[in-house]
Amino acid sequence: MAASRVFAQRLASTMKVARPAARIQARTLTTQRMATPFQTIKRQQPSMIQASARQAFAARRQYSSEIADAMVQVSQNIGMGSAAIGLGGAGIGIGVVFGSLLLAVSRNPALRGQLFSYAILGFAFVEAIGLFDLMVAMMCKYV
């Protein structure tokens, strides 16, 4: 097992040494083969087409990808912040529901049970709106 590890390392190092020589030989063979004037023109045509395509694309898009990515991040953060403001509204709504419960029970203590069930129902509605708002805020940021 150890002998195969040593052999594999030596083989890899000799291949690493031999690679540049093989590349140089391949380059000289390809340059010798494509020495005719027709071949050089043929090689230049795709590069001209690619250059004109790049220029057309650059003329169409006047911003860099870094700026576009930064603007997407800023809009996500603004959307999340705007949606998170609604969570404050949910907190205020819960406070109003239980404040009204205290006021109603102080005026008519006999209806305490019925008023408390209505208050729990109002709390559930306000909490559902708050959770929906939190879900929208997370979707603005991460989707």
Swiss-Prot record:
Pfam families: ATP-synt_C. Keywords: CF(0), Hydrogen ion transport, Ion transport, Lipid-binding, Membrane, Mitochondrion, Transit peptide, Transmembrane, Transmembrane helix, Transport. CDD domains: ATP-synt_Fo_c_ATP5G3. F-type ATPases have 2 components, CF(1) - the catalytic core - and CF(0) - the membrane proton channel. CF(1) has five subunits: alpha(3), beta(3), gamma(1), delta(1), epsilon(1). CF(0) has three main subunits: a, b and c. Signal peptide: none annotated. This is ATP synthase subunit 9, mitochondrial. SUPFAM superfamilies: F1F0 ATP synthase subunit C (SSF81333). The chain crosses the membrane at residues 85-105, 119-139. GO terms for molecular function: lipid binding; proton transmembrane transporter activity. It comes from Emericella nidulans (strain FGSC A4 / ATCC 38163 / CBS 112.46 / NRRL 194 / M139). It is found in: Mitochondrion membrane. Mitochondrial membrane ATP synthase (F(1)F(0) ATP synthase or Complex V) produces ATP from ADP in the presence of a proton gradient across the membrane which is generated by electron transport complexes of the respiratory chain. F-type ATPases consist of two structural domains, F(1) - containing the extramembraneous catalytic core and F(0) - containing the membrane proton channel, linked together by a central stalk and a peripheral stalk. During catalysis, ATP synthesis in the catalytic domain of F(1) is coupled via a rotary mechanism of the central stalk subunits to proton translocation.
